[in-house]
Amino acid sequence: MHPVRKKRLLVITAIVLILSAAVGLVMYALQQNINLFFSPSQIAMGEAPLNVIIRAGGMVVKGSVKRNSDTLAVAFDVTDFQYKVTIEYRGILPDLFREGQGIVAQGKLNNDGVFEATEVLAKHDEKYMPPEITEALKNAQRSTGESAESVQSTY
């Protein structure tokens, strides 16, 4: 092989190896920062992984909020109008957290099917709905045949 071609082949091989390593490192870093969203229906059907950081959300079921008077622990149910999931959280809830409102929580689903949240986010006004919750509510509406308003009034 001609020395110039050999040198060119080595340079191209080195560039390909460096780019492959860079892409691999970026993919590894991004994999650890991806938090997938699961609706209460998906969680109830076993689609959500256990003990992995995920996001879950829905509408807070009216009358489901239970606070511990001695600690900052709170438990409440969220629904997509098909299934309910219990969320446990230790901390101060957002000011906009209310029963009947949409929330998104980040945390882990334990072996008992209870979502242990490390962060709870509430919607910021009466018109905003997180896209994940909007999609979950539309899917629930399609499968039950009821309007979201009529189902929401029961919760």
Swiss-Prot record:
Q: Which Gene Ontology BP annotations are present?
A: cytochrome complex assembly
Presence of keyword Zinc-finger? no
What are the record keywords, sorted?
Cell inner membrane, Cell membrane, Cytochrome c-type biogenesis, Heme, Iron, Membrane, Metal-binding, Signal-anchor, Transmembrane, Transmembrane helix
What are the record's GO terms for cellular component? plasma membrane
Q: Which residues bind heme?
A: 124, 128
Q: Where in the cell is it found?
A: Cell inner membrane
Cytoplasmic-side stretches of the chain, per the record, are 1-8
- Ranges facing Periplasmic side: 30-155
Q: Which family does it belong to?
A: Belongs to the CcmE/CycJ family.
Name the chain's protein: Cytochrome c-type biogenesis protein CcmE
The uppermost taxa in this organism's lineage are: Bacteria, Pseudomonadati, Pseudomonadota, Gammaproteobacteria, Oceanospirillales
